[in-house]
Amino acid sequence: MEDAAAPNSGSEFNPGARRGKSIDECQDMIRRSFRNPIVKFLMEQMEKSGCRVGDNFVKAVVCTGPVAGGYTKGRGITVCSNYLTIQDEVNQVVIHELIHAYDECRAKNLDWTNCAHHACSEIRAGHLSGDCHFKRELLRGFIKLRGHEQECIKRRVLKSLRGNPYCSEVAAKDAMEAVWDTCYNDTKPFDRAP
C-alpha cells in the first residue's frame, strides 16, 4: 500500500476518483480533519484509554496501490495523498483508521493475522465511520434502498481481508460471519453508531 510498509488494515479507494493531492496539501487536510467532532472524540477516547496519539500519528504518504489509507500497528495512520481529492474523503479515512487504532488500543491482544480479529475491526470501522452511508454508496454506484448498509460493510470487509495474506477467501467469509453480530453491535467508544 504505502511505499515504506504495508498497513495491517486499509481503507478502500474509490477507483472513479480523480488524481489526488500533494503530500503537503493532504497533510493540511489531515490537520483540518482534527477539527471534525468524530475525529476529536476518537482521539480523546484513545488518550483516555492510555494510547498516545502524537503529532505524527496520522501522516500523508504517496501510496502504490489503489487504497485511501491504512493503519499499521506501532506506526499509526497513513492517508494516501495521491488518491484523495476532497476534505470529506480525508475525514472519512482518518475516522475509519482511528477506529482500527482504537480497537488495538482497547484490545491489547488484537492480532491482525487472525482473520476473526481483522474482520471484527473492519466491521466496526465500516459501521461506525459512516463508510456505508446511503449517499456514499450511491456515489460508488451501488443503489439499494433496503439493507444497503450491512451489505456494503460485508463487501468492504471481504475486500479488506483479501489483502491479508493470512486469510483465504473462505477463511475471511467464515470469520466475518462468525463475528458479525458481536462486532456490528459493538459501538464503543460511541453510545450508538454515529
UniProtKB/Swiss-Prot annotation:
Disruption phenotype: No visible phenotype. GO terms for molecular function: metal ion binding; metalloendopeptidase activity. It is found in: Mitochondrion inner membrane. Pfam families: Peptidase_M76. Signal peptide: none annotated. Coiled coil: none annotated. It is a peripheral membrane protein. The keyword Flavoprotein does not apply. It is an enzyme of class 3 (hydrolase). Its main location: mitochondrion. Keywords: Hydrolase, Membrane, Metal-binding, Metalloprotease, Mitochondrion, Mitochondrion inner membrane, Protease. The keyword Isomerase does not apply. Residues 1-20 are annotated as: Disordered. GO terms for cellular component: mitochondrial inner membrane; mitochondrion. Its EC number is 3.4.24.-. GO terms for biological process: proteolysis. Zn(2+) binds at H96, H100. The active site is at E97. Belongs to the peptidase M76 family. Has a dual role in the assembly of mitochondrial ATPase. Acts as a protease that removes the N-terminal 10 residues of mitochondrial ATPase CF(0) subunit 6 (ATP6) at the intermembrane space side. Also involved in the correct assembly of the membrane-embedded ATPase CF(0) particle, probably mediating association of ATP6 with the subunit 9 ring. This is Mitochondrial inner membrane protease ATP23. It comes from Arabidopsis thaliana (Mouse-ear cress). The lineage of its organism: Eukaryota, Viridiplantae, Streptophyta, Embryophyta, Tracheophyta.
